């Protein structure tokens, strides 16, 4: 049995195997027919094409006529028939020998393997359509009925220019997440963020540095996308909404302790580095008890518990701190009985030595110092909306989280609390019908998180990317480079899973080699043919003695790191404003990489008109529900 070598790699594994060539069998059959034709014509020529031989066309007879003549006249003309047969055998033999030689030559010839060292290539239009970033062409039924092909929807992930210079927007409408690498001042806002927010009609959460996105997109989203637009700017008095994180605690249910523990973790770990020190861990335990105590006491007094009130409770100058521990340990929180989590936290503080207890208290108060700012305290004193309303309100809701550059660092703990609660509270349950999940929300939610790593490590975000798409949440994460994401100090570390859970990745020309190397690996390896010319002969001779050319298949990255670094960026004027788009690359899992073109919203008259709609001067406010979501059974002591 002949052993067949397995040279299939890459796409060849899934492609249909080529069928054996039928050329040589056809040539062999033609040789046999040619022999019959030669014998027939030789015999007819011998008898001067006599009419008795039968019908012909220009003295040309059917090839099989010699067989009929042999049966009919062999006894009368044996010599003539033998001569005709010899002529036919000669012609057939020559033809079959030629076929045999061709078979030997083709069998001993090597077959080129264009995927030997890699099969990476740039995507063509059909690849981009298959990836879902371009609308498909109209089918036959749509052409006959005059219907248009489905239009593209979803978020903008880039642009693409065909060979004729036609520009197409690339949009992704699936539930999968998007990760963007774009250095500062590279045009990601005018190319990706603004077009997306000027076309996405469902709910959204937007981190907005300096309020630029609010100014450019809130007007259209409110007036034409029929969104309720909320501006949450904790350090401003300019008419934004207020939000109290403690209103989201599901007080009186079995979830209350977990909710408060999640909140306290974010308070004492503002950078997402983990609770490593003894003081962080003890301050965390203390804050869990104090926050729960403040919630129950405010409920009984008919007031509202807030983070500023928690800070005031710990820093009350007119009350000895020991009185607070005693109150927490004896207060009847639930049905006249003391809450076990609150009492335990108070007894821990009473059992500690005075010096240690003072250090724990000081650590806890230091994490609440942000809420001593009267502006911030006012903006977290009540709730003009609830997290659940982002996806469950009758109208879609757009929440802009606005921070000014000079307040960005100090407000980060509060922003982290909000993002954490959005993910945790909106991805809490899933309904099924007929073995399939069904949407329990009214509107999908887009989380447009610009400068995502600047929020610090949000472990819930990293873990939840794998499943929040099933709850109608689509994340669009933007970072400056791969180092910012993989940093061990401020990011998610080398073994992060953010990139693993983002189906689409796109990138503007990077500034760091590490990002360029990452993009080069994403693009893949390809096979190219290298030509080598060898010459021989005397240097002083008029002509060289011999010139030989050899061809070799070699491997190279489809996009090398230095080529990635040298991708054309956007062209800017003297004022630093972008005038012409640069290049970019887009990666969709399972499809060839796309060498694209950056979109610019101000080059599109539709987007320019939408961006010109003035933003509302005052934020919308939603109807605040009377109590936090109390799903679940009440707890008992």
From Swiss-Prot:
The UniProt record lists the keyword Membrane: yes
Domain of life, per lineage: Bacteria
Periplasmic side: 44-84
MF GO annotations: DNA binding
Identification of the protein by name: Conjugal transfer protein TraG
Transmembrane segments: 23-43, 85-105
Family the entry assigns: Belongs to the VirD4/TraG family.
SUPFAM superfamilies: P-loop containing nucleoside triphosphate hydrolases
Residue intervals on the Cytoplasmic side: 1-22, 106-637
Entry keyword Transmembrane helix: yes
Oligomer status and interactors: May form multimers of at least 18 subunits.
Organism taxonomic ancestry: Bacteria, Pseudomonadati, Pseudomonadota, Gammaproteobacteria, Enterobacterales
Cell compartment(s), UniProt: Cell inner membrane
NCBIfam families: PRK13880.1 (NF010453)
Gene it is expressed from: traG
Keyword set, alphabetical order: Cell inner membrane, Cell membrane, Conjugation, DNA-binding, Membrane, Plasmid, Transmembrane, Transmembrane helix
Chief place of localization: membrane
Role played: Required for conjugative transfer of plasmid R751. Binds tightly and specifically to the relaxase TraI. Can also bind to DNA without sequence specificity. May form a pore-like structure that could serve as a channel for DNA transfer.
InterPro entries hit by this protein: P-loop_NTPase, T4SS-coupling_protein, TraG/VirD4
Gene Ontology annotations for the cellular component aspect, listed alphabetically: plasma membrane
Membrane topology per record: Multi-pass membrane protein
């Amino acid at each position: 049995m002949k052993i067949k070598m397995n040279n299939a790699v890459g796409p060849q594994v899934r492609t249909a195997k080529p069928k054996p060539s039928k050329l040589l069998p056809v040539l062999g059959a033609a040789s046999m027919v040619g022999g019959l034709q030669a014998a027939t014509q030789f015999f007819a020529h011998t008898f001067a094409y006599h009419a008795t031989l039968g019908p012909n066309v220009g003295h040309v007879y059917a090839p099989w006529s010699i067989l009929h003549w042999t049966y009919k006249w062999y006894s009368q003309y044996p010599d003539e028939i033998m001569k005709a047969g010899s002529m036919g055998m000669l012609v057939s033999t020559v033809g079959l020998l030629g076929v045999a030689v061709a078979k030997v030559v083709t069998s001993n010839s090597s077959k080129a393997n264009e995927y030997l060292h890699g099969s990476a290539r740039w995507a063509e239009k059909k690849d981009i359509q298959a990836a879902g970033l371009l609308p498909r062409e109209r089918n036959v039924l749509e052409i006959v009925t005059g219907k248009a092909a489905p239009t593209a929807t979803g978020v903008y992930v880039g642009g693409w220019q065909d060979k004729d210079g036609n520009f197409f927007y690339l949009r992704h409408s699936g539930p999968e997440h998007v990760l963007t690498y774009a250095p500062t001042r590279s045009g990601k806002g005018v190319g990706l963020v603004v077009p997306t927010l000027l076309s996405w009609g469902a709910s959204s959460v937007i981190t907005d540095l300096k309020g630029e996105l609010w100014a450019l997109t809130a007007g259209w989203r409110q007036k034409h996308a029929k969104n309720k637009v909320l501006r949450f700017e904790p350090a401003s008095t300019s008419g934004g909404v207020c939000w109290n994180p403690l209103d989201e605690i599901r007080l009186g249910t079995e979830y209350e302790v977990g909710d408060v523990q999640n909140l306290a973790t974010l308070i004492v770990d503002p950078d997402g580095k983990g609770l490593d020190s003894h003081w962080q861990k003890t301050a965390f335990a203390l804050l869990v008890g104090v926050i729960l105590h403040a919630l129950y006491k405010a409920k009984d007094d008919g007031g509202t518990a807030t983070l500023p009130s928690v800070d005031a409770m710990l820093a009350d100058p007119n009350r000895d701190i020991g009185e607070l521990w005693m109150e927490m340990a004896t207060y009847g929180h639930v049905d006249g009985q003391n809450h076990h989590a609150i009492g335990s936290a108070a007894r821990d503080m009473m059992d500690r030595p005075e010096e240690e207890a003072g250090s724990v208290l000081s650590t806890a108060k230091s994490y609440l110092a942000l809420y001593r700012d009267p502006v911030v305290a006012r903006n977290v004193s009540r709730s003009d909306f609830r997290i659940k309303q982002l996806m469950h309100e009758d109208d879609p809701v757009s929440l802009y989280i606005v921070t000014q550059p000079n307040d960005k660092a100090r407000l980060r703990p509060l922003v982290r609390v909000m993002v954490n609660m959005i993910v945790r509270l909106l991805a809490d349950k899933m309904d099924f019908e007929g073995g399939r999940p069904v949407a329990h929300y009214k509107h999908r939610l887009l989380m447009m998180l610009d400068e995502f790593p600047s929020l610090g490590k949000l472990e819930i975000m990293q873990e939840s990317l794998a499943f929040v798409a099933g709850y109608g949440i689509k994340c669009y994460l933007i970072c400056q480079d791969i180092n910012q994401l993989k940093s061990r100090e401020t990011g998610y570390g080398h073994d992060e899973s953010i990139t693993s859970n983002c189906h689409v990745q796109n990138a503007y020309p990077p500034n760091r080699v590490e990002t360029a190397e990452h993009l080069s690996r994403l693009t893949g390896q390809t096979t190219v043919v290298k030509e080598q010319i060898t010459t021989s002969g005397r240097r002083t001779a008029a002509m060289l003695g011999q010139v030989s050319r050899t061809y070799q298949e070699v491997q190279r990255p489809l996009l090398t790191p230095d080529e990635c670094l040298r991708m054309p960026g956007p062209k800017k004027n003297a004022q630093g404003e972008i005038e012409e788009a640069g290049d970019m690359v887009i990666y969709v899992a399972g499809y060839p990489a796309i060498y694209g073109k950056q979109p610019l919203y101000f080059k599109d008259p539709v987007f320019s008109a939408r961006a010109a709609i003035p933003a509302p001067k005052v934020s919308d406010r939603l109807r605040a529900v009377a109590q936090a979501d109390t799903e679940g059974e009440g707890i008992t002591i």
